[in-house]
Curated annotation (Swiss-Prot):
Entry's Gene Ontology molecular function annotations: phosphatidylserine binding; virus receptor activity
Family note: Belongs to the immunoglobulin superfamily. TIM family.
Sequence repeats: 148-155, 156-161, 162-167, 168-173, 174-179, 180-185, 186-191, 192-197, 198-201, 202-207, 208-211, 212-217, 218-221, 222-227, 228-233, 234-239, 240-245, 246-251, 252-257, 258-263, 264-268, 269-273, 274-279, 280-285, 286-291, 292-297, 298-303, 304-309
The protein's name in its UniProt record: Hepatitis A virus cellular receptor 1
Signal peptide range: 1-24
Cytoplasmic side stretches: 419-478
Species of provenance: Chlorocebus aethiops
Keyword Iron: no
One Pfam family hit: V-set
Cystine crosslinks: 41-110, 51-62, 57-109
Region (28 X 6 AA approximate tandem repeats of L-P-[MT]-T-[MT]-T): 148-309
Amino acid sequence: MADPIMHLQVVILSLILHLADSVADSVNVDGVAGLSITLPCRYNGAITSMCWNRGTCSVFSCPDGIVWTNGTHVTYRKETRYKLLGNLSRRDVSLTIANTAVSDSGIYCCRVKHSGWFNDMKITISLKIGPPRVTIPIVRTVRTSTTVPTTTTTTLPTTTTLPTTTTLPTTMTLPTTTTLPMTTTLPTTTTVPMTTTLPTTLPTTTTLPTTLPTTTTLPTTLPTTTTLPTTMTLPMTTTLPTTTTLPTTTTLPTTTTLPTTTTLPTTTLPTMTLPTTTTLPTTMTLPMTTTLPTTTTLPTTTTLPTTTMVSTFVPPTPLPMQDHEPVATSPSSAQPAETHPVTLLGATRTQPTSSPLYSYTTDGSDTVTESSDGLWNNNQTQLSPEHSPQMVNTTEGIYAGVCISVLVLLAVLGVVIAKKYFFKKEIQQLSVSFSNHQFKTLQNAVKKEVHAEDNIYIENNLYAMNQDPVVLFESLRP
């Protein structure tokens, strides 16, 4: 039992060690924005594939890979800024990032593939990109020209001690005072890198002027906003309230005169008690007066147009030769066209008097030639029919007679219609008055028995109702 347990423990420990994937120590790399930075990564053993991952590496692969290789060549590059400038055949897979930015800061992982489970090599690199450094040259002014006159003036009194020439070598310290070229080394001792820490704060202060111009742009935008009062022409569009003439269309309430049409109830429709005078059917003798249409036999006098036969006869009295013009026959003649033989000096020919298809032109010998629209095909002569003034008078008489007869008929019809209208109106008035005044007398008359000997006459006279109905019924009472 102990051997399987020990074997299981060994397997678990080996798995824990392999899960570590032989992770190397994490490396921190600092850089400056705008420059290139190299993230180191090398491996040993056989040449194999590898990948660079943005962020920590997972157990099996590079989930956010930015560069992939097959061992000798780059197979994938997320951006052109990512380059492997090392010798891949010598297992140098260091990553170079060109033109770095502050956003490039973060964790990078170099993963090298090895055979076997959990044998991949992983190197985690923490990259920190700082802002770019601005170097400000420091100019130092050394006023050495002021010291040279002072040294020359001081040496002149010392030249008076010529006997003590031994002091001259001591005065040879003047060349030592010519350390002015030594002061020229000051540009070399411009320890600018030492003072570069100060400019790192200075750019932060110099950013303030950069922000100040941005604030100066605000006044430039303010004048642009002053153009908004120029857009205050919108109050000029307040002419829209002048369109408040629409309330003047409130004259529609003046159309409330429609309630004045409520005078219809004042038509005293309760006076429709006339239907209560339905006793009029008791006077159903009034339909007996419908014999008035029998008087419409007057239109039978329309036989008057038959009198037009009188005007169609023309006496056959020849007249001397004269020019004749064609006369159009009356269109009102309803009878068939009559032909009259006319005897002239030449040959005779009968022609219908009512035919509108012939027109004649006469020459001096009373011969008639057919017009260009005639029906004859040969050039033959024809005598024109004889027309007398008596025939013209008869046609005029026909017109006059027809007109007079029509007027008479219209007058008769007008009289009949007017009489019928007034008669009907009078009958209605009489029936209403009779029903109102003699209703009780009629009831009394109905109660009495009517004997066979009573002389009751119902005259079929159209104009009998012109009498007073009261007098009529008084005379009929026993």
